[in-house]
Amino acid sequence: MATSHFILKLFLVISFCNVCFASRKLTALVQEPENQLLQYHKGALLFGKISVNLIWYGKFKPSQRAIVSDFITSLSSSTPSKTDPSVAKWWKTTEKYYHLANSKKSLSLYLGKQVLVENYSLGKSLTQKQIVQLASKGEQKDAINIVLTASDVAVDGFCVNRCGTHGSSKGAIIRGKTYKFAYIWVGNSETQCAGYCAWPFHQPIYGPQSPPLVAPNNDVGVDGMVINLASLLAGTATNPFGNGYYQGEADAPLEAASACPGVYAKGAYPGYAGDLLVDKTTGASYNAHGTNGRKYLLPALYDPSTSTCSTLV
C-alpha cells in the first residue's frame, strides 16, 4: 500500500502539473517528524463545510459533466460507495494533515452549484487572470470554485508545464467583510496533450513507453481531468493559501498528491501506474469506487503519518 522514500524521489522526474497560491493564517502549530517530506509552513488548512462549485467553460456533454460531479459527491463520507476501495476512503488520507497540525477543525465537502459558460465568452485562449475571473462566478464564501475548460480551449501554460492549477482570490464583500475563496482550474487535454495530462490513459509523451490503460468512464480526457482534479483538491485542502503543507518553492511546490507523481497502486515505477484493479467487462483500470456505480483512477497521496505514498490498492 505504500512506496518508499527512494521511489518517491525517483518519481519526481515525471511530475505532471504545477500549482499556484495566495496566503492566510492558522492558529494551530505542528510538530513534524524529522523525515517529513512536506514541511508545514504554519498557514491555514481548509476547514468547515465547503461547497464545491463547478464552472464549465466551453462545450461538455452531460455525460462528461456527470463523471466529474459524481466524483465530487463521492468524496463525502456521508454518501460513500458501498464498495471498497472508495473515493471517500482515498480522501480520508487528507485528514492526517489536520491531525498532524493538532487541528480540531475538519473539512467537509459537498457539491454546490454548476455554472455553464458554453458560449466561450472570454474566447478560446485564456490567461490565468481570466481563469480567476471565471472562478469568481462561483460562491464567494466557504467555497472551492473549480473551472473546467473544454478540449478546444487553450490556457496559459497548459500542456507546457501544467495540467491545472489551484490558488485563492478575494471574493465579494459580504456583510462588510471580504472573504477569500479557493479555486482550481483543470483542462481537458484529450486533443492537446493527453500524453502529458491524461497518462496512463494515453501513451506518454516521454519516458518509458507502455500501452495506455482503458479509462474507467470511457473518456480519456475527462478521466484524465479527474486525476488532476483529485491531485489539486488534495493540495487545496492541505495548502489552500500557499503557506500550508508543501516542499520546495512556494510557486511550484510538491504537495499531498504531486509529491507522489505517477503512483496509483502498489508496484508502481516510472512508466507503470501500479497493480490496478481491472473491470472484467470493460477492461478499464481503476482503484476507487464512487457513487452511482462509478469507477475512478486516483493518485497516491503522501501520508504524513508514515512518510510514504499511500495508495488504495
UniProtKB/Swiss-Prot annotation:
What the record says about the induction of its expression is: Induced by phosphate.
Q: Which residues are glycosylated?
A: 119
A single GO CC term, please? apoplast
Does the keyword field hold Mitochondrion? no
**Which keywords does UniProt give here?**
Apoplast, Glycoprotein, Secreted, Signal
Q: Which Pfam families match?
A: Phi_1
The region annotated as signal peptide is 1-22
- What is the annotated localization of this protein? Secreted; Secreted, Extracellular space; Secreted, Extracellular space, Apoplast
Extract the coiled-coil ranges from the record: none
Q: Which family does it belong to?
A: Belongs to the EXORDIUM family.
What functional role does this protein have?
May be involved in the regulation of cell division.
Q: What is this protein called?
A: Protein PHOSPHATE-INDUCED 1
What gene codes for this chain? PHI-1
